[in-house]
Design a protein with these regions (language model features):
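Short, solvent-exposed loop/turn segments at secondary-structure junctions
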Residues: 25-26, 102-104, 119, 141, ...
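Non-heme Fe(II)/2-oxoglutarate
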Residues: 42, 46-55, 195-197, 201-254
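Short, conserved beta-strand element in jelly-roll/cupin
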Residues: 89, 115, 122-143, 189-192, ...
Length: 254
């Protein structure tokens, strides 16, 4: 199914997120994950992979692409399943805002503090939260290895004030304290191939990876075309036509 079900649409509207089980098939996960491991672990010590630290000193590796090309990463970001899902939920013509890999290595991957994606996309020149992300689990993702956590329904708050702390952009503490009192805190366990689809104003975070397992996730974020940044604040996120490809095309790409 390329578009959300009625239940998924309702969950997105009310809860700000839903999980689509088996979004990628097992062969697709293996193909994409094995390629990613080979390429990105080779790049880990180069300037093309960033390190994002947390307050304890642990670091998560991050690879960000500015454009979606014809390689395996770009082709998955252009896959019709992600594009049609995003278009249906946003309700407007969309384009790919960014795509990135977050890599929490065993015993090393750091935490991400509570934030809203729109908390910093707004500062990049996007006026409205007509944006979402699709987070695809490439490994088993659970509480032990730093799965995503959400405050269920918190997207209804709109954009909250954020502050810069320890190299991260986090929700200002008084607002966070009030939000955690009001909304249910959910740990989102995921199997490889599952996809978490979430609103740009949903409060979310993840803990450090304290396990002996990898916890990698591929994140594609989409924006309404009319909501493209009004200023070129970053190399990524600016409007480019999304050239959608058939489902699974990435498996034939290098």
């Amino acid at each position: 199914m390329l578009v959300p079900s009625k239940e998924e649409m309702r969950a997105y509207e009310v809860d700000g997120y839903f999980v689509r089980k088996n979004f990628l098939s097992e062969p697709e996960v293996v193909d994409f994950r094995d390629h990613a491991r080979r390429q990105l672990e080779d790049e880990a010590n180069s300037s093309t992979v960033m390190e994002k630290g947390d307050k304890s000193g642990k670091k998560t590796l991050l690879k960000l692409w500015n454009h979606a090309g014809d390689d395996k990463f770009g082709m998955l970001a252009r896959d019709e399943r992600l594009a049609r899902m995003s278009e249906a939920l946003i309700g407007e013509e969309i384009y790919l805002y960014s795509h990135k890999m977050t890599m929490k290595q065993p015993r090393e991957g750091g935490a991400w503090e509570w934030h809203q994606d729109f908390g910093y996309w707004y500062n990049n020149g996007c006026l409205s939260p007509e944006m979402l992300s699709i987070w695809i689990a490439l490994d088993l993702s659970n509480k032990a290895n730093g799965c995503l956590q959400v405050l269920k329904g918190s997207h209804i708050l709109g954009r909250l004030d954020h502050v810069r702390e320890n190299g991260q952009t986090n929700v200002d503490k008084p607002y966070l304290d009030a939000a955690t009192e009001r909304f249910e805190h959910v740990y989102v366990d995921m199997d490889p191939g599952d996809a978490l689809v979430f609103h740009s104003n949903l409060l979310h975070r993840s803990d450090a990876n304290n396990s002996d397992t990898y916890r990698w996730g591929y994140i594609c974020s989409y924006n309404a075309v009319h909501n493209a940044p009004f200023t070129r604040a970053r190399e990524y996120g600016n409007y480019e036509e999304l050239k959608i490809v058939p489902a699974g095309s990435f498996m034939a790409a290098g």
